[in-house]
Design a protein with these regions (language model features):
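Single conserved hydrophobic/aromatic residue that forms the stacking wall/gate
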Residues: 1-7, 11
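A generic structural signal for short, solvent-exposed coil/turn residues
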Residues: 2, 46-48, 79, 106, ...
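Short, solvent-exposed coil/turn linker segments
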Residues: 4, 23-24, 119
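An acidic-aromatic substrate-binding cleft motif
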Residues: 12-84
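Aromatic- and carboxylate-enriched substrate-binding clefts and catalytic-loop regions
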Residues: 89-243
Length: 243
C-alpha cells in the first residue's frame, strides 16, 4: 500500500508487475503468479459450474443465430455430454426475446444450460451487433440480469470493450459483481487480459484476449499460421491468465 498525498489520507495500491523466469519453459506454463498476488473481491452464495459448450458462430457465423439452428446445437451439446450452449450476437432480433423462454425450456429438457451474448456498449462502441445498451448502464444492466435470472440463463458473454482505460476496467468489475448478484457466470470477449480474475471473481469464466481461432473465419493468413500460433499461446497468453 502507498499512502496518498490527498487530504483524505486514503491508502492506494499500485498494480503488480511480475516476471516469471525458469531454466525451461515448464515454470512459464505452470506459473501461478497472476493469482498469487491478488485477493478475492467478493464471496458468492452461488454454486457456479463452468463446463463445455457448443457454439454455432465459430462454424456458421451470424446466419446460424436463429431458433432452428440453435436447437441443433442444443441437441449436439446433449449428444456430446456438454453442459452448455452459447448463443452469439443478434439473438434478440433473430430468435427474439419472447421466444427465449421457450428455447431455454427446450435446452433444459435436454440437460443443457444457456449462455447469451451481449455488447458491452458505451459511447466508445459503434458496433451494429445486438443486444446493445444493456451492460454499460447500472440500471439497465440490473434489469436485464433480473430477466435473465428469471428465465434460467446461466451466463453471459460480453463483447467489444473499449481499451484499458479506467472507466472500461471498472465496467468489467461492475458487470461481474452485478452478474453474481443474479447467479450469472461471465465470459469476456474482445477484451483486456485477465489478471488473476479467476481468483478475484467467483463467477468469472474466461476471456478471449488473444488473436486466435475466431480469425480463421476472416483471413487465409490466419489459417496458414494457426498451427504455429497455437503452439505459442500456452507460453505467451496462458502464462498471464486462462482463456
Amino acid at each position: 500500500p502507498i499512502k496518498s498525498s490527498a487530504a483524505s489520507d486514503v491508502y492506494k495500491r499500485q498494480p503488480w508487475r511480475t516476471v516469471t523466469v525458469g531454466e525451461t519453459l515448464k515454470p512459464i506454463v505452470e506459473t501461478t503468479v497472476p493469482w498469487d498476488v491478488v485477493e478475492p473481491r467478493y464471496t458468492t452464495t452461488h454454486d457456479y459450474k463452468p463446463g463445455r459448450g457448443t457454439w454455432s458462430w465459430i462454424l456458421w457465423q451470424d446466419g446460424s443465430i436463429n431458433y432452428d439452428d440453435q436447437v441443433r446445437y442444443v441437441d449436439l451439446a446433449a449428444a456430446m455430454g456438454y453442459e452448455y450452449v452459447l448463443i452469439d450476437n443478434w439473438w434478440d432480433n433473430n430468435i427474439g426475446r419472447d421466444r427465449m423462454e421457450q428455447f431455454i425450456k427446450y435446452a433444459r429438457s435436454k440437460g443443457v444450460e444457456v449462455f447469451l451474448w451481449y455488447s458491452s456498449s458505451g459511447y466508445w462502441n459503434d458496433i451494429e451487433q445486438s443486444p446493445v445498451n444493456r451492460m454499460d448502464n447500472s440500471i439497465a444492466r440490473k434489469q436485464e440480469m433480473r430477466w435473465l435470472q428469471s428465465l434460467g440463463v446461466k451466463g453471459i458473454k460480453v463483447d467489444f470493450f473499449g481499451g484499458d482505460k479506467q472507466e472500461t476496467l471498472r465496467l468489467y468489475e461492475e458487470i461481474l459483481s452485478d452478474a453474481d448478484d443474479h447467479g450469472l457466470m461471465v465470459i469476456f470477449h474482445g477484451c483486456t487480459l485477465p489478471r488473476g480474475w479467476e481468483r478475484m471473481y467467483p463467477n468469472y469464466v474466461g476471456s478471449e484476449a488473444v488473436l486466435a481461432s475466431e480469425n480463421l473465419v476472416f483471413s487465409q493468413h490466419f489459417c496458414d499460421n494457426e498451427a504455429f500460433n497455437a503452439t505459442l499461446h500456452p507460453f505467451i497468453r496462458n502464462a498471464v491468465g486462462c482463456m
